[in-house]
Amino acid sequence: MAKSKNHTTHNQSRKWHRNGIKKPRSQRYESLKGVDPKFLRNMRFAKKHNKKGLKKMQANNAKAMAARAEAIKALVKPKEVKPTIPKGVSRKLHRLAYIAHPKLGRRARARIARGLRLSRPQTKAKAKTEPQIKGKVKAQIKAQAQAQIKSKGKGKAQAETKPKAQAETKPKAQAQAKPKAQAQGKPKAQAQGKPKAQAQAKPKAQAQAKPKAQAQTKPKAQATPAAPVPAQAPPKGAQPPAKAP
């Protein structure tokens, strides 16, 4: 009896359109597009009939599973989960979520990174300048100590020279100050002495003038002869005074 053309085990794709036979698995599912269809078909028959080639089938099966997984990874694209900023959270968490957002926080992250970059060289520069600063401080301390020693020596020299200079300058200063003081004191003394002298001279002049005037008037009064007194007539019956012998 002749075999039916509809049940051939090889090259079934010729009669798909006529007999309604299913496509092999490799063509039936998109996930198995890259797998060899012959391998899948043979593996199916080996499960049922070929017990001798079980080890070979297992090895091939492992290869097929690995290829299938790779094909699935390549074909199936994972859906991108759009990040959302939660609402009704505290301000701090809201800010952190904004910075972590891939699109919205791009500028914020760039600004933070820039600030970090700018701050790093400053710390390095500080570390470099620390020994320089220490050297400068040491030099300043040495200079101050030397200046103090010099100032002490100058102070001693000045203390020794001061009495000499004062002894030399005192007579000069006195000699220069005397004519100046006399020149300044004369008009002041004259201006002050005039009213005092006048006030003192007035009572003295008056006191001297009074006795002089009295002394001049007294001798004048004495010098003038007294007027003659008329002689009184003797009373009647009275005897005249006797004449001296």
From Swiss-Prot:
Query: Where does this protein have coiled-coil stretches?
Result: none
InterPro entries per UniProt: Ribosomal_eL29
**Which positions carry Phosphoserine?**
31
One GO BP annotation is:
cytoplasmic translation
Per UniProt, subcellular location reads as: Cytoplasm
List residues modified as N6-acetyllysine.
Answer: 33
Residue stretches of biased makeup (Basic residues): 1-26
Keywords annotated in UniProt: Acetylation, Cytoplasm, Methylation, Phosphoprotein, Repeat, Ribonucleoprotein, Ribosomal protein
A GO molecular function for this record? structural constituent of ribosome
Give the residue ranges for region: Disordered: 1-33, 114-245
User: Sites of the modification N6-methyllysine?
Assistant: 5
Q: Where is the composition biased (Basic and acidic residues)?
A: 157-171
Q: Where is the composition biased (Low complexity)?
A: 134-150, 172-226, 234-245
Query: Which Gene Ontology cellular component terms are annotated?
Result: cytosolic large ribosomal subunit
Highest taxon of source = Eukaryota
Main localization category: cytoplasm
Please give the family membership noted in the entry: Belongs to the eukaryotic ribosomal protein eL29 family.
**Task of the protein:** Component of the large ribosomal subunit. The ribosome is a large ribonucleoprotein complex responsible for the synthesis of proteins in the cell.
Quaternary structure?
Answer: Component of the large ribosomal subunit.
This protein is called Large ribosomal subunit protein eL29
According to its UniProt entry, this protein's organism is: Oryctolagus cuniculus (Rabbit)
Q: Which gene encodes it?
A: RPL29
